[in-house]
């Protein structure tokens, strides 16, 4: 027997082949979409971790800023105290210098008066002896 194939007999084969190609394309797209969804989930996880680290860094930065401000004020006061002590020392040094200079002047005046008194005494005794 002779079997004659017509166009209608070949149509199911072509349709079946097209269906298989379409199914293969759908499977490929599904695989790509699964990979993309996995990547999106991984990125979301990474972003969540990064967000947590950013929050921790922000909290640490705020704490650092507060402690840096306290430290700045502490050293500012230390600097003020040091300048006050230095100022007092300079004033004391100036007072000591003034007292020393005044006492030196006083000593010179006293020595000058003492020596002029001796000179007057010597002259008067010399004058008395001549008469």
Swiss-Prot record:
The keyword Coiled coil applies. It is found in: Cytoplasmic vesicle, Secretory vesicle, Synaptic vesicle membrane; Synapse, Synaptosome. The lineage of its organism: Eukaryota, Metazoa, Spiralia, Lophotrochozoa, Platyhelminthes. This is Synaptobrevin-like protein. It comes from Schistosoma mansoni (Blood fluke). Keywords: Coiled coil, Cytoplasmic vesicle, Membrane, Synapse, Synaptosome, Transmembrane, Transmembrane helix. Residues 122-131 have a biased composition (Polar residues). Residues 1-81 are cytoplasmic. SUPFAM superfamilies: SNARE fusion complex. The keyword Iron-sulfur does not apply. It comes from the Eukaryota.
């Amino acid at each position: 027997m002779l079997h004659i194939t017509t166009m209608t007999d070949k149509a199911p084969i072509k349709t079946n082949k097209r269906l298989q190609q379409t199914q293969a394309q759908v499977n490929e797209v599904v695989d790509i979409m699964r990979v993309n969804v996995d990547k999106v989930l991984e990125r979301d996880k990474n972003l969540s971790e990064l967000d947590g680290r950013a929050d921790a860094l922000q909290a640490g930065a705020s704490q650092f800023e507060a402690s840096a401000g306290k430290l700045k004020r502490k050293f500012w006061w230390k600097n003020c105290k040091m300048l006050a002590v230095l100022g007092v020392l300079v004033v004391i040094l100036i007072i000591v210098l003034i007292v020393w200079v005044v006492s030196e002047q006083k000593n010179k005046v006293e020595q000058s008066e003492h020596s002029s008194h001796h000179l007057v005494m010597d002259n008067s005794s010399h004058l008395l002896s001549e008469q």
